[in-house]
């Protein structure tokens, strides 16, 4: 068993490596804690998940009152973390992680899911192989903390696009996911990381406008067209798509909207089919 002093020494010793492999939300929360004198109000489930991760690292404590959830960073860690975040090696590694995350989000949008083994290999190849943060356990935790994930029946770990409802269906209908695309142009990769491809842009814009018209500007949701596109990627039938659309709208779909949905259904690449 560790003594309290030994636990504190271990936390301090691992601080640079742990800080290097924080997720984007965890890293932003640490910056906020430092800027706010060691206290930050937690807002939303993403920040709460990040706060719980910092608790497990023994960095922070959580305080819950009637109105707020407050995260506290002890003074003993504020100065060391502040210095670490300013180090050039930390900033360079975080910059490489940003490119890795963009590639991973693009791969997930193109494929729906991604082998964690391939993602881990890519993370080592592009970020960690020659760095001070070469720690496989932390690298795997980074992947799982920053993405939805799933274990198949064989125990293999996959990272998932957040819109994917049934990973087993993708594996059944399309085989193994295509993974990273090393020759993907940077502009295309950036758009894919934001859940849109250049060839999908026009239909997406038209569909958004038509949905706005049918739903009324006061009730229209910006994500509706995106949600329908993600649904089509998952091999739903035309009748299933139209059932969802009718449930969304206060009026029957117009001819223009139906025609646009036909284009969406015909030309949206399905996950697992590579077309």
Regions found by a protein language model. Name each.
Residues 20, 40-44, 90, 94, ...:
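Short, charged/polar micro-motifs that form catalytic or ligand-binding hotspots
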Residues 2-12, 61-90, 152-174:
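Accessory beta->alpha helical hairpin/"wing" motif in late/C-terminal subdomains of nucleic-acid enzymes
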Residues 12-47, 99-127:
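Short amphipathic alpha-helical interface segments
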Residues 251-275:
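Long, highly charged low-complexity segments enriched in Glu/Asp and Lys/Arg with interspersed Ser/Thr
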Residues 41-65, 130-142:
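Short amphipathic alpha-helical interaction segments
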Residues 74-110, 165-193:
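Short, amphipathic alpha-helical interaction segments positioned at domain boundaries
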Residues 131-244:
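Long, charge-rich C-terminal accessory regions
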Residues 3-26, 86-101, 199-203, 216-218:
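Short alpha-helical segments that sit at the start of domains
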